[in-house]
Amino acid sequence: GGHCNELVAERIGKTILLESNGHFRSYARAHFEYDLGRDSLINSSFSTEKNEAGSSDEAVARLVAKWRAATEVELSALLGFSSREYLANDDRLQRAVVESWLQIDSAAAIAINNRLALRAPLPQGEVTLADIVGLLPFENTIYAVELSGAEVLQVLAAGQSPFVTGLIRTENDWLLAKTGRLIDADQTYRVLINSFMYEGGAGYDAIAKFDSAGFDTEIHYRQPLVDWLLDQDSSANKPLTLP
């Protein structure tokens, strides 16, 4: 499953595995016959099918058109105006995302995001909600976890492409941005991450082991950036420049 887009329909032991490939080119399906009275499976079959020579259903097409129009109105909302384009891997854009997270939780000292969470650039000129959805396209929320300094350092060392704010990297150490002091291996820090990381994605499986009671803020991981952009009140006459 996951992101491999491999067309699969097969049985392994008593389990049927199904997966379609990308862009709705095909699908996998299974058929089950079940005896409810005897609470038993009578028969099962599975197959893969290609989407060929299909035609749209008018009722479905109208429904899709209705919601597409409504979505386009929402996504066209203007959030600001950027002085230049910032690529997804640009530290300035990465920093803007994680620093916006810290603004929703004054008790948090550190925020960590995986770099690949950003999937599109911030464009030059008008910035709309659609641009931010493209930038942060996944349905992740922000988690708050309690980690010791030693655990924070382990997460940064083991995770895939971390971008961190609240800490300053020196040649050999990490300093707390608020105090300028070395991170204390034994002290507990409140750290903000995204739910994908808490679930173990991109090599961050240690986080949930360190704090099995992580708090899901239920705040979408792109919302703080949206709010921050609106707060900047940027325009063509006063364009946004990321530090």
Give the label of every model feature segment:
Residues 1-74, 163-164, 169-177:
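Active-site-adjacent helix-turn-beta-strand microarchitecture at beta-sheet edges
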Residues 20-23, 88-92, 133-134:
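Short Gly/Pro-enriched turn/cap motifs at secondary-structure boundaries
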Residues 44, 54-127:
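Hard-cation-handling environments
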Residues 96-243:
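Feature captures C-terminal
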Residues 29-42, 79-95, 151-163, 219-222:
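Short, charge-rich amphipathic segments
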Residues 29, 74-77, 142-144, 188:
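Intrinsic-disorder/low-complexity, polar/charged segments enriched in Ser/Thr/Lys/Arg/Asp/Glu/Gln
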Residues 15, 50, 54, 58, ...:
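A near-ubiquitous, low-amplitude feature marking generic local secondary-structure context
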